[in-house]
């Protein structure tokens, strides 16, 4: 359904723009330039057409950026809008609120959502992990007898 709003052919300038943004994104992440992530997540191929289906997209994105998010974008075909934030390193629960930006950004997105969305949304505050993808369950299980894999899968 949401693929139907995308163009079957794209202008060369749009393709060049998005390819350049991917390079910018990789560079920003590899060089830990969080403030440049905003430019690395700019898009002209899938977000503008999907904004017609998700009229809240740009109000949520603008609210997150205005509140201090480093980047914000439509995740896949949506409806998830993801904001990248930062704060002090370490245990979130032992830090002073002023060290963290995610709550202010979440509040701004909630307020924008209440104003522009017909349905309520949820905010999930997460953090990146270095582990990557892992197996949660295997059937049949890999673990047998006294040999155990992480998570006992």
Task: Walk through the language-model features, giving the residues of each.
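Short, acidic (Asp/Glu-rich) active-site segment that either coordinates a divalent metal cofactor
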Residues: 1-6, 10-12
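Glycine-rich, charge-dense phosphate/pyrophosphate-binding loop(s)
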Residues: 18-23, 29-153
């Amino acid at each position: 359904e949401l693929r139907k709003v995308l163009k079957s052919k794209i202008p060369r300038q749009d393709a060049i723009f998005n390819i350049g943004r991917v390079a910018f994104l990789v560079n920003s992440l590899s060089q830990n330039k969080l403030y440049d992530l905003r430019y690395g997540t700019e898009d002209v191929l899938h977000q503008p057409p999907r904004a017609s289906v998700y009229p809240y997209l740009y109000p949520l994105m603008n609210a997150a950026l205005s509140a201090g998010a480093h980047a914000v974008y439509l995740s896949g075909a949506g409806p998830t809008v993801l904001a990248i934030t930062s704060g002090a390193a370490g245990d979130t629960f032992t830090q002073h609120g002023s060290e963290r930006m995610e709550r202010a950004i979440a509040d701004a997105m909630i307020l924008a959502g209440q104003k522009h969305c017909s349905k309520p949304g949820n905010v999930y505050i997460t953090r990146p992990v270095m582990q990557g993808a892992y197996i949660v369950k295997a059937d049949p299980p890999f673990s047998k007898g006294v040999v155990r894999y992480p998570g006992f899968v």
